[in-house]
Amino acid sequence: MIERIWSGQSRLYLLLLPLSWLYGAVTWLIRASYRLGLRSAWRSPVPVIIVGNLTAGGNGKTPVVIWLVEQLQQRGYRVGVVSRGYGGKSAVYPLLLSDNTTTAQAGDEPVLIFQRTGAPVAVSPKRADAIKALLQSHAVDFIITDDGLQHYALQRDFELVVIDGVRRFGNGWWLPAGPMREREGRLRSVDAAITNGGLAAEGEIPMQLVAREAVNLVTGQRQPAEQLQHVVAMAGIGHPPRFFATLNLLGIKPENEHAFADHQDYSLAQLSRLTSGPQILLMTEKDAVKCRAFALPNWWYLPVDAQLPSDRADKLLLNIQALSPDTK
């Protein structure tokens, strides 16, 4: 239902407009208070790159964070990542991730980024505290914040917005009548915009999510995803239909599809009921980090990588590298 409302297919959004105007007013006042100097924002001693969204829901932000970390690492830079840690609850903040950190403590996205990139990752509701903790333990050249475009208590050196190229900005209204955290005009003040799928508007950098080989959660075996048989697909991400569409593009026709809420916790009892007989369960990598501890032998996940045009990617990276006093 919420997708129909946000996409403009349902006029029920009209009932939510008073709340949206309130949300928009509060958001504007918060940002204005920092711009006018009424509230002070903390500045990191190393450059901060925000990777965020204008809209709620899955836009492909985490693959962009992973891509950016890996690209800077390949160029010889030391990169740290901070996050709010949505979906996790730690007894102590800030929390520096280790090999023993669980998604229940840190959230699924920080754990995924940590496992994929090997970069130091810290989480805290106050991102400045996360950065301070990270810098006390690691020497880094850049800090990348996973989300946080609207977290104006943190000064930033580069703002990168990720846009869903298919859904774009829906009906254009603020939450909850629409998907917007801030209005579309905010794009005029960011440093770069990456468009995930669909058609990129002028000035936006097009991006595609490219699937890798499927990986077995228990054995680590890799296999072309299109060779998997009797697939039951599941996705607990911001926009599950994107994962199911990726499978269709690979020629995979799942026998069943199960969409779960973003950041949802799973149990063995819950997921084991989704398959029977020769069926296998195929999930996103973000789901896999929450399931590996109790996975069954017929569970697989499908990693995806962000892919950008090389010329646009090089220009973006050069602009970011220029922020470092140690430009390589």
Swiss-Prot record:
Keywords: ATP-binding, Kinase, Lipid A biosynthesis, Lipid biosynthesis, Lipid metabolism, Nucleotide-binding, Transferase. Transfers the gamma-phosphate of ATP to the 4'-position of a tetraacyldisaccharide 1-phosphate intermediate (termed DS-1-P) to form tetraacyldisaccharide 1,4'-bis-phosphate (lipid IVA). InterPro entries: LpxK, P-loop_NTPase. GO terms for cellular component: plasma membrane. It comes from the Bacteria. This is Tetraacyldisaccharide 4'-kinase. Pfam families: LpxK. Pathway: Glycolipid biosynthesis; lipid IV(A) biosynthesis; lipid IV(A) from (3R)-3-hydroxytetradecanoyl-[acyl-carrier-protein] and UDP-N-acetyl-alpha-D-glucosamine: step 6/6. Coiled coil: none annotated. Belongs to the LpxK family. It comes from Yersinia pestis. Transmembrane segments: none annotated. ATP binds at T55, A56, G57, G58, N59, G60, K61, T62. One of its GO terms (molecular function) is tetraacyldisaccharide 4'-kinase activity. The keyword ATP-binding applies. GO terms for biological process: lipid A biosynthetic process; lipopolysaccharide core region biosynthetic process. Its EC number is 2.7.1.130. NCBIfam families: lpxK (TIGR00682). HAMAP family: LpxK. It catalyses: a lipid A disaccharide + ATP = a lipid IVA + ADP + H(+).
